Regions:
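Juxtamembrane regions of bacterial inner-membrane/periplasmic proteins
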Residues: 1-296
Length: 296
């Protein structure tokens, strides 16, 4: 009896999944993904959604967005975003199955969504075409569009689209608009600390501020900065600045003339001066490998 109920329940679940997939395929079918290889997108689903929300609430809506080519975006910002949002971006096919599995397990244990498993490609699909709508088939739409994006566009183009359409505050879209709004500089002039702060707030740009980070964002800043330093993408000094730590104390300067002066110390007759000390061996400087160099 129990076994029969199990198989009946499984059959029902599979039937529902098949139905949702079919609905998703039909709904996203008309979307032109390949055209994004040649031109920039218009206003995204998220932009239109925010405008509707403002209109419904009777509040003014302002939109700031500036398109900037990927090569004109700070390399540290690119790397920080990848570390924060999708560390396997250049190796997956649009879906990170390990992350999906881990997120599903954590969410089931917590009985709520505590961790997302979306890749940058999935986030781009959501931002451009789906918005925040909650339907049983929306996740399938996102998965299908992500796979289509990966088939039709290069990784660099996907990253460029993502950085130019992502939301970074109320009415602020794209990295250049965000850099100018929060820090008064263009996307190419962002320093390491600014880049890390912008990457840290992507999880909820409406709630969190890159210039006044709370404890959760401070923890994310530390995580991103630590990974970038470990991979040689930022220096020790940049790491300390990003975390608000004081600079390391410099070694006291040594007067080089003292090293060459003769020893005039008074000694008993017959006692010779001690031999000069052997110089300390100098360790060879290590070369850091930039594991995110593909985005540089």
């Amino acid at each position: 009896m129990i076994r029969r109920l199990f198989w009946q329940a499984l059959a029902l679940v599979l039937a529902l999944v098949a139905l949702f997939v079919a609905i998703a395929v039909v709904r996203v079918g008309p979307i032109d993904v390949s055209g994004l290889a040649r031109h920039e997108p218009g206003r995204s689903a998220v932009m239109l959604e925010r405008e509707r929300e403002a209109r419904d609430q009777g509040v003014p809506y302002h939109e700031s967005r500036r398109w900037v080519p990927l090569e004109r975006v700070s390399a540290t910002l690119r790397r920080a975003v990848l570390v924060a949002e999708d560390d396997k971006f250049f190796t997956h096919d649009g879906l990170d199955w390990d992350e999906i599995r881990i997120s599903a397990q954590k969410n089931l244990r917590a009985h709520r969504v505590v961790r997302g498993g979306s890749t940058i490609t999935q986030q781009l699909a959501k931002n451009l075409w789906l918005g925040s709508a909650r339907t049983p088939w929306r996740k399938f739409e996102e998965l299908i569009l992500a796979m289509r994006l990966e088939r039709n566009l290069t990784k660099r183009r996907i990253l460029e689209l993502y950085l130019n359409t992502i939301e970074w505050g109320d009415g602020i879209y794209g990295v250049d608009a965000a850099a100018r709004y929060w820090f008064g500089v263009g996307a190419g002039a962002l320093d390491a600390s600014q880049s890390i702060r912008l990457a840290a707030v992507i999880i909820n740009p409406w709630r969190f501020s890159p210039v006044a980070p709370d404890e959760r964002i401070q923890n994310r800043i530390q995580m991103i900065a630590s990974r970038l330093r470990r991979r040689g993408a930022i220096s020790e000094e940049e790491y300390r600045v990003a975390l608000g730590l004081p600079p390391e104390a410099a070694a006291p300067a040594v007067d080089s003339t003292l090293l060459s002066r003769p020893d005039t110390t008074s000694r008993p007759p017959g006692e010779s001066a001690p031999p000069p000390a052997e110089p300390e061996p100098v360790a060879p400087e290590s070369t850091a490998v930039d594991s995110l160099g593909a985005t540089g």
